[in-house]
Amino acid sequence: MADEDQYRGDDQIDEEEEEIDESGYKTVKDAVLFAIEVSDSMLTPRPSSDSKKPAEESPTTAALKCAYHLMQQRIISNPRDMIGVLLYGTQASKFYDEDENSRGDLSYPHCYLFTDLDVPSAQEVKNLRALAQDGDESEDVLKASGERVSMANVLFCANQIFTSKAPNFLSRRLFIVTDNDDPHGDNKSLRSAATVRAKDLYDLGVTIELFPISRPDHEFDTARFYDDIIYKASPSDPDAPAYLQTDSKASPATGDGISLLSTLLSSINSRSVPRRAQFSNIPLELGPNFKISVSGYLLFKRQAPARNSFIWLGGEQPQIVKGVTTQIADDTARTIEKWEIKKAYKFGGDQVAFTPEEMKSLRNFGDPVIRIIGFKPLSALPFWANIKHPSFIYPSEEDFVGSTRVFSALHQTLLRDKKAALVWFIARKNASPVLGAMVAGEEKLDESGVQKFPPGMWIIPLPFADDVRQNPETTLHVAPEPLIDQMRYIVQQLQLPKASYDPFKYPNPSLQWHYRILQALALDEDLPEKPEDKTLPRYRQIDKRTGDYVLSWADELEKQYAKISAHGPKSTLVERSAKDRTSEVEDAAPKPYKKVKVETDEQGVEDVVRAPYQKGSLSKLTVPVLKNFLKAHGRSAAGKKKELVERVEEYLEQK
């Protein structure tokens, strides 16, 4: 959500609602500049290893497609974010709108600013798509220079772009895509100049992200040059990007262009949006007068279609509307000033007004804090207790020096002892306090060694008694063992790869359709005919894997049903033969019981029950009659007489 606070007045911001507005954590604007190297090796198509995808693709083209896809995503989800594309190593030179013979060629040789750092327009998106997909269009621009490119010039060019186009952005990123791990060789002066320019970018607040690509005959080694110019973001900075480590492995060089694109895109997407702080530098109290400082992040949140801003479509180009709210009296249409507005509650028919200070005090439960109350084993934390989004916390050194060391010791202790801390948690001012479980989380890496989840602590809000509802009454029916055994083979064949669900492979179809429509409107494209739904089952593959097992299970189901039907109890509402009634009496003879007269047909039971219901005397009926009525209408007949009467009344009220 981009700059949502501009639609809210100061009084709305001060008098925050009790529920935390999680959408507000996405409001920081982001500026991303792609720096893509254009060299002979980067322009060489990589051989395809898949016979189904014979088309070859060069790393430069794959990187341009990454920039295009990211631009597509951000123009819809974050319309105020800026994205630019800088090509370096090109034969031509261009800086802003200057031609090859102007100052740009002299200042930044072999640097071609293809897309200026700005909010992408529809035409810029189309131009980038043409460069990435049209061979004729790319021939004029993607020509490698025979001379070496100074990385100091590239970094200084990026510095000028960020300074002039995004001077006040809190999040500024430079994405470098290259396969050259040592651009300057033994030239110490060029290496030193590049290091100085990288330090200038870091001091400016620009984060450099490297996306290395290995060559077929050479593995990319960041230690040769790039380790000296890339600075790790400080964890104490709440506006820093998510703490994802630099890729330990470079993008593969042996795969085809599509797999290379997928690898780059997934790597870029994982670092494309900074995870904003949910709360910053609040105290974590481990005991009396023993505090450290932590910041919290919201790493998981369900995405849903939402309005980022209002768009005016009446002009030649769509424009983002700046909202202004004015309060007007209903009867006189007079503009109401802020000091004239009062809030009141109804008590006994009268409105009792409260001052703003009194309203604030009503919602004030204390200063923001995370206070440890005690510790419990992880086994005492049930799975169903996780009812809200957990908060990821990480230490901060701003308020208390040494917080990282204490936090690390607590994290390791909770992991080793398999315990969770019970905490009193107030996330921010005016927020409702909650009891939460603070659980230590381990670091998780993917197959290529890239960090998926950082080590830290998770605060899981625990439900109060009012949040836990009673499960509806159901009757448990356990299937026979042969059916369970047959189904076990089916389930084993339908398991996902590595028995884990990857949400990135199954995007929300309704959300993607919503974005696709917005994208078509923004880029002046034809509206798509039908949505792409990757959540639909692959019926052919399912039939291929489990078809025989399903048929075998169906045969077993018929056999088990026949057995159950043959040995099942006889209903008292079905007319039976004299032989069945005689055998039932003989079976029951050793166990005498009080015989109760019941009706033998459904209509009879209906008449017997409905008449007392209309008179309000259902409780005078006997338990067997009530049970027979409930069984005849497919309702549960378990429980005491009071419960049976309530079920009968509920059924008859619906009729």
From Swiss-Prot:
Disulfide bond is among the record's keywords: no
Catalytic reactions of this protein: ATP + H2O = ADP + phosphate + H(+)
CDD domains given in the database record: KU70 (cd00788), vWA_ku (cd01458)
Record flagged with keyword Transcription regulation: no
InterPro entries recorded: Ku70, Ku70/Ku80_beta-barrel_dom, Ku70_bridge/pillars_dom_sf, KU70_core_dom, Ku_C, Ku_N, SAP_dom, SAP_dom_sf
Enzyme class at the top of the EC tree: hydrolase
Keyword annotations: ATP-binding, Chromosome, DNA damage, DNA recombination, DNA repair, DNA-binding, Helicase, Hydrolase, Nucleotide-binding, Nucleus, Telomere
EC numbers: 3.6.4.12
Ranges annotated as biased composition (Basic and acidic residues): 1-11
Start and end residues of each SAP domain: 618-652
Biased composition (Acidic residues): 12-22
Pfam families from the UniProt entry: Ku (PF02735), Ku_C (PF03730), Ku_N (PF03731), SAP (PF02037)
Record Gene3D superfamilies: 1.10.1600.10, 2.40.290.10, Ku70, bridge and pillars, SAP domain, von Willebrand factor, type A domain
GO CC annotations on file: chromosome, telomeric region; Ku70:Ku80 complex
GO process terms (BP): DNA recombination; double-strand break repair via nonhomologous end joining; telomere maintenance
Domain (Ku) ranges: 284-493
Region (Disordered) location: 1-26, 568-589
GO molecular function per UniProt: ATP binding; ATP hydrolysis activity; damaged DNA binding; DNA helicase activity; double-stranded DNA binding; telomeric DNA binding
Cellular localisation: Nucleus; Chromosome, Telomere
Main location: nucleus
PANTHER family per UniProt: KU AUTOANTIGEN DNA HELICASE (PTHR12604), X-RAY REPAIR CROSS-COMPLEMENTING PROTEIN 6 (PTHR12604:SF2)
Function (record text): Single-stranded DNA-dependent ATP-dependent helicase. Involved in non-homologous end joining (NHEJ) DNA double strand break repair. DNA-binding is sequence-independent but has a high affinity to nicks in double-stranded DNA and to the ends of duplex DNA. Binds to naturally occurring chromosomal ends, and therefore provides chromosomal end protection. Required also for telomere recombination to repair telomeric ends in the absence of telomerase. ku70, of the ku70/ku80 heterodimer, binds to the stem loop of tlc1, the RNA component of telomerase. Involved in telomere maintenance.
Family to which this protein belongs: Belongs to the ku70 family.
Subunit structure, as described in the record: Heterodimer of Ku70 and Ku80.
Entry protein name: ATP-dependent DNA helicase II subunit 1
